[in-house]
Amino acid sequence: MTTKIQTVLLTGKTHTTGSRREGAPHGDDRLDLQLSTPGNAGNDIAFTAIQAHPAAEQLFAGAWSACYTGALGLVAKAKKVTLPSDMSVDIEVDLGKTGSAYFIQARIDVRMPGVAHDVAEAIAQAAHDVCPYSKAVHGNIDVATNIVATDAVAA
């Protein structure tokens, strides 16, 4: 059972692109890491532009976003859908309080330009069944997944 946060104390934000090799755009409060996919030859792990003291919420959002982006790719491949090169995932993880208890909650925005909204939504929801981070938090924290409107084609 999840509990609604009454007061947000801190928000960790990440932006992950489909390729993940180009890094994330710079922002005032975003953790900017170049991520790699395990098991791919020539895909060295690199941490670039690391902030001096990233918050745990930023690190969790970054790890989840990398994993979830990979899960989107796996689900799309199984559904024979080609993801656009400019696909992206934004995850925000809030640390907050309700009374004297601390909780986290998350928002996930998925952008798949050129993919029909219903197809993108089906891929995004199915990716939660693949991603270990999504499975770990399922039923434990509030998670809102949104497909951000883009110039998608009709279904």
Regions found by a protein language model. Name each.
Residues M1-A155:
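Extended beta-strand/beta-hairpin segments
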